Amino acid sequence: DAIIRDIRGLLKSFKIKTYNEDTGYGLFRHVLIRTGYHSGQIMVVLVLGSPILPSKNNFVKALRKLHPEITTIVLNVNGQKTSMILGEKETVLYGKGYIEDELCGKTFRISSKSFYQVNPVQTEKLYGKAIELAGLTGKERVIDAYCGIGTIGLIASDKAKEVISVELNSDAVRDAIANAKRNGIKNVRFYNNDAGVFMHQMADAGESADVVFMD
């Protein structure tokens, strides 16, 4: 709340107009803040209708001075007249462009457009119970459908022979691949595809799996 409040103040100081949904005029559309529950890392995503932020460097400097706890700042461009919050193009204004957090003993990279569970404490319980009920013995071929940044598949990989993770969001797949490398996991493969289509293709090819996780 404090970060958003101060961004509002900076918009006035820098005379940056906010976006009007009805008219389509204005530059500043949204602010998205993501926080690592365990790491405490903070990502601020500024969503603009144009890639040009007036006095960009000074704006970022002023925001960082007010909130030195911010880990990274990303500029996202959404020039479409749409209810969708995020656009396709992004520029990293400060930091790495992503944050990291811990889940079930593994480290995960989270970028602005990647899905991550909003309640990590409950997520650990949920994933633990799902893996327990799956009864993995180390011999199974597992599908992680709609895998996002790879969380459940990477966590389950310790108890499976092979994990096939499928996700349509290409940004999330990039994070998932990085997460596998970050955690030294080599028995997981990632596919950038619709999970339903992918599983039909597997079936048509005569392939099968022992367990499917669907979140």
Listing of model-derived features with the role each one plays in the protein:
Residues 55-215:
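Rossmann-like S-adenosyl-L-methionine
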Residues 29:
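RNA-binding accessory domains that recognize and position tRNA/RNA substrates
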Residues 37-40, 69:
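Short flexible coil/turn linkers enriched for glycine and charged/polar residues
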Residues 35, 48-50, 77-79:
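Non-catalytic surface loops within mature trypsin-like serine protease
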